[in-house]
Amino acid sequence: MSTILSEKKTLSPWAKGGIGLGAGALLLVLVGLLFPTAAAFFPLVSLWCSCVLFYGALWVLHTAGVELDFFHRAAIIAFWAGAVLYFYWALGRRQFIYAWDYVNYIQKQFNTEAAFALGPVAGFKYIISTFSEDYTNFITLFTEFPFCLTAKTGDSYAFAQVFCVLPSLMLMLAGLTIKIGQILEVKNKFWYFIIGFSWVLTYPFLRMSAMLAQPDWFGLIFAFAILLLTLDYRFEKLEPGRFVLIFLATAAIILSRRWYLYFVVGYYFSYALLLFVSSAKLAKQGQKGLALRRVRNLILFGVCTMAAMVVLLWPMVSKILAFNYSDRYSYYNVGGIAVELYYHAMRTGLLNLILILFGLWLCVKRKKPSLPVLALCELMLSMLLFTRVQNSGSHQMLLYVPAYVILFLCGAAGLAESIEHFKIPKLCFWVFTLLFAVSVRCSPLTVMALPEFVIHAFHPADLAEYQRLDELTYDRKDKPQIQAMAQWLVEHLGEGEVAYMIPDDMLYNPGHLRNCDLPNHALDGKLPDSFSVPGTHYFPTGFFDARYVVTADPFPLSLAPDTELGHRFNAVFLQLRETTHQQVATFDMGNGTVFTIWERTTPVTREEVETYLHEFDAENAKYPEMFSAVAENWLAVHGL
């Protein structure tokens, strides 16, 4: 009771916060019962969830033995205000159309809003029903507020994350900075915190996906919580409160994005290995009882946690066990571990590598190698596991960020502890790195994080096409033309009619037409996703249902042209179109690409369907359930 009641028998801040959250939950229950279809219910649920998350983050800090004094709190508020200004500036200086993975969460937010409009039961049922999917709706619980107050565009969804995700994330990041400082026994705490916290906060790949309306960095809140609760904990005694927080953080990070499992497996394996090694050293020093107690408690906690996790997340676990991801996602595996190492070298950058060397120097000097060893072990194990399936995109780089944060903070400690030697050059190095990091372009094709002025200043011949595509997709100068083409389809498609767009590329795909005027999405249900990725996309029977077919010249092929399927489908269409379709409209994009819209003039025949299907005989032999079975089912339904 001492933690709840003071000497004057007054409630502690923790108790007051818990009571406030409990009262809020009761209020939500009453609103849900009395006004089940109220428009404000889901936003209120979202606000309450964000408050619970922030309260939980504070409790993690308390359990981990981390205290934020006035200086830390002031720094967090100042950096958060800077982040607000940065997002506002960065999002406002570009025209980006959210498509593909970059619109998934926005679409899920709209769908969740529609589900809650039917009542609380329908809303929560819809969220839970997605827990086995690649993209769950768990994050939508936290992002609805303040997204509901915005214009509901792609940019506003990205900006809303500064208010619903970033506060808790910064709190965890600040706590982790302090915790690593404690472990390394940093003496120059002021410079260490300022350098370390600012360095990891401005790391480009921390915010890269958020700038593209992918709130996957939400999962890092729980990753950092896991680090805070385990980095200096050795299971010498059982702490049920700590165990509950570790379990909840692990479940939450997996629900955030399934590929965070690679971090979970890599980190816990590396952590257990480190604990076994340290316990073996204790046993050699004559402390066998303590060593055995550590190992026993770890195994007991691990077995119980794994069993509970399997039960809690069984829909996701069963799908993982039944699905061959390495086969179905082979399209995204562009070179295995060798290419992944290259990506990491480019994404880390020379400046960060220099900082890491400072950290390694400090850890060797102070004979505290556990942190960098743990980080490097987790990094390599997660990388080896992930590249068995695919190579990482910019958003999947987030699963490696916890390891890099440990390495960066070790480097910040090394820099701070030696700051009095060559102080001005070191401070200039830190400031230059921050300015470099905040000016990095955050685009879908970013591999090497570079500022705008560097991208515009250097034009190597072998990267000319890559830079052209990056420029076209990052800042859409052709947005008016895309909107005009989308409007043409809206005006010409009647009730129940659909169109089909053959290109499915980073440069142009159906999502660009569907989402070019958010929050309006009049083409939803009228322009389905296209056919491009082997092992993932099914044979496109939507093409045969379509009144209009949209294609482009030249056909866009910026990603994996050797294995992409859409251009082969388009080649067959070019051969047959004069006998099956007529041209009805053209749209010049102003960048060398011209779109044409073709209207079907003859009924579909079995021979036509089989002509398209035979182009993919090799794929059909490997995935008959995705090709011939789909085609035959469509033919049977249409009496062909």
Model-derived features: positions:
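Hydrophobic, aromatic-rich transmembrane alpha-helices
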Residues: 53-63, 172-178, 272-283, 348-372, ...
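Membrane-proximal lumenal/periplasmic loop motifs of glycosylation machinery
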Residues: 92-103, 117-141, 162-163, 208, ...
